[in-house]
Amino acid sequence: AQKLMEAYHITEAECVYASQTVKATKRESAWRTMLANTVASLYVCEALRDVLRGQMIFYGEPFDAFMAKEMYCYLSKTIDRMVKQNIRKRNTLKYKNQYRFGIACRLAFRIDELGQQVSWAPEREHKLLAVKKAAENEFGIIMRGELKTPLRDKAFTRGVADGGTVSLHRQATARNGYLEG
């Protein structure tokens, strides 16, 4: 195996880590970035954005990257559904995005609490550093930009309040879909 890896110039990180992509917008939104980074840290992955292709990439061990992608898709669809249910159509896009950002902030807090309760939490920091180093080797230097989000009090606080109602214990079944539990 070592000879084949040397012959084809493959590193061990390329064999251990995989990436999962999610279709995203080319324009960066604060709530999606916050949600992706939080979910990625829970599943020991690195969340990257490919602006040219409009993709969100979760990079880590194959199962962890898959779980991060699925959780991100579930939570982002849930947030969009909550916006349609709870916010009137005539409200502005800024108001809706602040509501989404409020939900994402509350979910980030809840996911961080959930991450502290897992049995492998002490080892997570070392794994995150290894994944980050492998992602930099794979994709190049990773730049993090500051997201500007002016808070509109009413929309943000409504989002934070409604973010507590989102279920984080969704279970996949063998049937044609998912059950919320």
Annotate each predicted stretch with a short phrase.
Residues A1-Q2:
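Basic, Lys/Arg-rich alpha-helical nucleic-acid-recognition elements, primarily the DNA-binding modules
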Residues M5-G181:
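Extended, helix-rich structural scaffolds rather than catalytic motifs
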